[in-house]
Design a protein with these regions (language model features):
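HotDog/MaoC-like acyl-thioester-processing domains
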Residues: 1-14, 96-101, 105-173
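Well-ordered beta-strand positions in beta-sheet-rich domains
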Residues: 18-23, 89, 137-141
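Hot-dog-fold acyl-thioester-processing enzymes
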Residues: 2-85, 147-173
């Protein structure tokens, strides 16, 4: 594919298309800020003494912090990717420590037109930590915009359920 995957139209995507993001180093301030925003002050993330005696020997990043940062690392084109539709099979595979750099590797696993204006794209989503080892893995579904010419022609099957952001042929904000 010549167009970067996260800037492509739905029709330009194929199963197996993949991407990898730049890195981001996790700092102590990230753990403190995330704890303050979410109220998750578990000592594994917030108490160095407690965490030092625990199974990881030191504080580690919140799993949800890693998942949240992974979405921010992905260079998403808002004119193409309309909405996050879902996350399934989320697994926190290994800890990420303060000072460790994460990146994301994603690959298209399925494509389904859901409306003349959009399609549903499933991605194998991996947050990578030290040495490229998988720290978090999930199945991510995103609502992807179809090319305007395709939408105008009305191609695609209406496969919409009650949770879909598409109703009456329109993508809802």
């Amino acid at each position: 594919m010549s167009t970067p995957i996260l800037s492509a139209w739905f029709e330009e995507l194929s199963e197996g298309d993949s991407f990898r993001t730049r890195g981001r180093t996790i700092a102590e301030a990230d753990l403190v800020s995330f704890s303050a925003l979410t109220g998750d002050w578990h000592p594994q993330h917030a108490d160095a003494e407690w965490a030092g005696e625990g199974p990881f020997g030191e504080r580690i990043a919140h799993g949800m912090l890693l998942l949240s940062y992974s979405l921010g690392l992905a260079p998403i084109d808002p004119e193409r990717i309309l909405a996050l539709r879902g996350l399934d099979s989320v697994r926190f595979k290994r800890p990420v420590r303060i000072g460790e750099t994460i990146s994301v590797r994603g690959a298209v696993t399925s494509l389904r037109p859901v409306d003349p204006a959009a399609g549903l794209v499933a991605l194998d989503w991996k947050v990578l930590g030290a040495e490229g080892r998988v720290a978090v893995r999930a199945e991510l579904q995103a609502l992807w915009r179809r090319q305007p010419s395709q939408a105008a022609e009305g191609e695609g099957e209406a496969a919409v359920d009650e949770l879909s952001p598409i109703q009456d042929g329109r993508v809802l904000a």
